[in-house]
Design a protein with these regions (language model features):
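C-terminal accessory regions
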Residues: 307-444
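Amphipathic coiled-coil/heptad-repeat helices and related helical stalk/stem segments
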Residues: 1, 28, 81, 115-119, ...
Length: 444
């Protein structure tokens, strides 16, 4: 690393790969503090608001989302908002990016951001600044971005494709006290199985002798969840599931049987954004847009109404990962209950054309689209309850208490992806991991 930092090569990138417990966090925390003392400029980035908050806490330095730093909103256009790659006005700055396994490079059709390829845009932005370089860090055993087989930002060949000189380091030795941590012991075993491509039988989870990993029968779930909520709070407890359908069942049960919430939406409800939204933050400096996966807490529910065959609510939200930033939005209630990640395409289209009919008197298509862009119902925020989420949604975050429900498992589900899923879920927990209704044959 010292060679990279002292090198005069501006086209170099440092790739720091490390598994759970190998000291990545401590190393980068020390690096950031040292750079500060040497008055060497650094900027910390992460793919999501929650990941940026976690990064900032352990580095003792402000951290931002990648999108916040590298994109800027284009001036008013006829279509919906677009963000272009920003000009990098910094000089001789090291950009340190955590949780790089989450950085996608699949060109997303209809993406509002730059080329739609986040890694391409990040590299273009950083190296357009005089003397600026990139340090990418992450864990290759974690889930790759949705739709990709591997995490492109953690592979040297992908980075060499930009004409960059890649300096890579792999931290493999576990330095945290593995003997005392069942989470770490099992996570290390899982990533060894992934590395050896030994993913053809259900992995045995070692529980005996460890205080931080517990098997939880279904009949103790409500009492244990309740105890975690009372002791550590809603924001330090999460249920991780394999599907949105399963997460829905949990969310419904938690709200009814533990939190005693009778209304569809109550003050204090914990929500997760289900789809990027650019409308409600257009005039706000604190957030450029509301990203898919961000968490929000309901501060006030004012009124609900039914229109176009959908249900909406005027709600004040607080975003805990953005210094409790408060925002008033119109929210689509229907997505709270769908088994899909957000409103299904057919329903989205139905909403679009229903709202469009309101502007049928406007004959110029461009003017009609302007009206759609400014319509609070078409732009209603799509959310889900956030007491239980899928593993992709939990990635980048950490909680004191993680309840893991892997659902019914058979050999046909055994793929490297399942092992990455399990590894990613295990490493979300900083305190206790509860294995809910785990099959006896998988426990040792």
């Amino acid at each position: 690393m010292s060679e990279f930092l002292l090198s005069s090569c501006n086209e170099a990138v440092f790739l720091l790969r490390g598994y759970a417990g190998t000291g990545k966090t401590s190393l980068v925390g020390a690096l950031v503090r040292t750079l500060d003392q040497l008055q060497q400029k650094s900027i910390l980035l992460a793919p999501t608001g929650r990941a940026a908050k976690v990064f900032s806490a352990y580095a003792g330095h402000p951290a931002f989302t990648i999108h916040k730093k590298i994109y800027r909103q284009q001036s008013f256009s006829n279509e919906l908002s677009n963000f272009s790659v920003n000009d990098n006005l910094t000089t001789h700055t090291l950009y340190i990016v955590d949780e790089a396994s989450m950085i996608s490079n699949e060109g997303l059709s209809g993406s509002m951001f730059g080329t739609g390829r986040l890694l391409d845009d990040l590299v273009q932005f950083v190296y357009s600044g005089q003397g600026c370089r990139l340090l990418l860090m992450g864990d290759t055993a974690q889930l790759p971005p949705v739709g990709e087989e591997q995490s492109p930002a953690l592979f040297a060949d992908a980075l060499k494709g930009y004409g960059l000189e890649v300096v890579e380091v792999d931290l493999t030795q576990v330095v945290r006290q593995e003997q005392q941590s069942g989470i770490l012991w099992n996570a290390t075993r899982l990533r060894q199985l992934i590395a050896e491509d030994d993913c053809y039988s259900l992995p045995k989870i070692k529980v005996s002798g460890f205080a931080d990993i517990k098997v939880l029968p279904g009949n103790e779930l409500i009492e244990t969840l309740n105890s975690c909520y009372d002791h550590d709070g809603l924001d330090e407890t999460i249920v991780v599931c394999r599907s949105n359908k399963r997460a829905n069942i949990y969310n419904k049960g938690i709200r009814a049987q533990i939190l005693w919430r009778e209304d569809e939406l109550n003050t204090g409800d914990l929500l997760m954004v289900a789809k990027n939204n650019y409308f409600w933050t257009e005039k706000e400096k604190e957030m450029d847009f509301i990203a898919n996966g961000e968490t929000a807490v309901v501060r006030r529910v004012r009124r609900t109404r039914e229109l176009y065959g959908f249900r909406f609510a005027d709600v004040t939200l607080v975003f805990p990962d953005y210094n409790d930033f408060e925002l008033e939005v119109n929210m689509l209630l229907d997505t709270l209950h769908t088994d899909s990640p957000a409103l299904p395409k057919a329903e989205n289209d139905r909403l679009f054309y229903s709202v469009l009919e309101d502007y049928a008197d406007i004959t110029v298509k461009r003017e009609r689209m302007k009206k759609m862009k400014a319509d609070p119902y078409y732009n209603a925020l799509q959310v889900k309850y956030a007491y239980a989420v899928t593993c992709h949604k939990a990635q980048g975050g950490q909680w004191k208490n993680v309840f893991l429900d892997q659902g019914y498992m058979t050999d046909e589900y055994l793929t490297p992806d399942y092992f990455r899923w399990l590894y990613t879920a295990f490493t979300r927990a900083t305190g206790t991991l509860y294995l809910v209704n785990y099959p006896e044959e998988q426990i040792v």
